[in-house]
């Protein structure tokens, strides 16, 4: 009986250590995961983007949400979290599963899930550290509307392979732009 308890306690301590070691030094660890996500997304491409030029679309990426120097760290983390959560939701649909290689999609889910966990741990640490509210509601809504436009586009295009290719390229672009926000956060620390 004592051995399972000791093992359980060891797991709890190790898990707590990994979360606490973030010390909310998230941008450095998160940017590595972001790069892995981008590499997986690049591998997911099945058709030439050039064959889909006629399907290009401006989804109105909320650049101002990722450019703003006015962001407090907690606000920036909540915006990054929302973007990753929406990406996870978008690629978790039945229509998405039918489009992408299953092995790559599983790796993609794993990376997104890890990023969400890291961001959630960091968000919890930031509560009370800053006087600003944890969730900047306007920024979160802007990110959600962006993903609604992407979903509407996919629906209008009947989830065609070219539509998914355009969306994949757009999400890669958004992850690249979010890296700029992460870099600014790292410099602020």
Swiss-Prot record:
Main location: secreted
SUPFAM superfamilies in alphabetical order: 4-helical cytokines
One GO CC term, this protein: extracellular region
GO biological process, alphabetically ordered: adaptive immune response; B cell activation involved in immune response; cellular response to virus; defense response to virus; humoral immune response; natural killer cell activation involved in immune response; response to exogenous dsRNA; T cell activation involved in immune response
Disulphide bridges: 24-122, 52-162
UniProt cross-references to PROSITE patterns, sorted A to Z: INTERFERON_A_B_D
Segments forming a coiled coil: none
Record carries keyword Ion transport: no
Subcellular location: Secreted
Endpoints of the signal sequence: 1-21
Domain of life: Eukaryota
InterPro entries attached to this UniProt entry: 4_helix_cytokine-like_core (IPR009079), Interferon_alpha/beta/delta (IPR000471)
Assigned keywords, A-Z: Antiviral defense, Cytokine, Disulfide bond, Secreted, Signal
MF GO annotations: cytokine activity; cytokine receptor binding; type I interferon receptor binding
Similarity-based family: Belongs to the alpha/beta interferon family.
Function field: Produced by macrophages, IFN-alpha have antiviral activities. Interferon stimulates the production of two enzymes: a protein kinase and an oligoadenylate synthetase.
Protein name, entry field: Interferon alpha-5
């Amino acid at each position: 009986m004592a051995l399972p308890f000791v093992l359980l306690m060891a797991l709890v301590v190790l898990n707590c250590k990994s979360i606490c070691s973030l010390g909310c030094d998230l941008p450095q660890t998160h940017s590595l995961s972001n790069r892995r996500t981008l590499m997986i997304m690049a591998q997911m491409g099945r058709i030439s983007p050039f064959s889909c030029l006629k399907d290009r679309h401006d989804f109105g990426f909320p650049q101002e949400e990722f450019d703003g120097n006015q962001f407090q760290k907690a606000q920036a983390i909540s915006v990054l979290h929302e973007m990753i959560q929406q990406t996870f939701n978008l690629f978790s649909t039945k229509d998405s599963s039918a489009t992408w290689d299953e092995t790559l999609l599983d790796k993609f889910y794993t990376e997104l899930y890890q990023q969400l966990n890291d961001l959630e741990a960091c968000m919890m640490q930031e509560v009370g550290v800053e006087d600003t509210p944890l969730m900047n509601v306007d920024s979160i809504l802007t990110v959600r509307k962006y993903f609604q436009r992407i979903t509407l586009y996919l629906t209008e295009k009947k989830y065609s392979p070219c539509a998914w290719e355009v969306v994949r390229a757009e999400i890669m672009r958004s992850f690249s732009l979010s890296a700029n926000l992460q870099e600014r956060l790292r410099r602020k620390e």
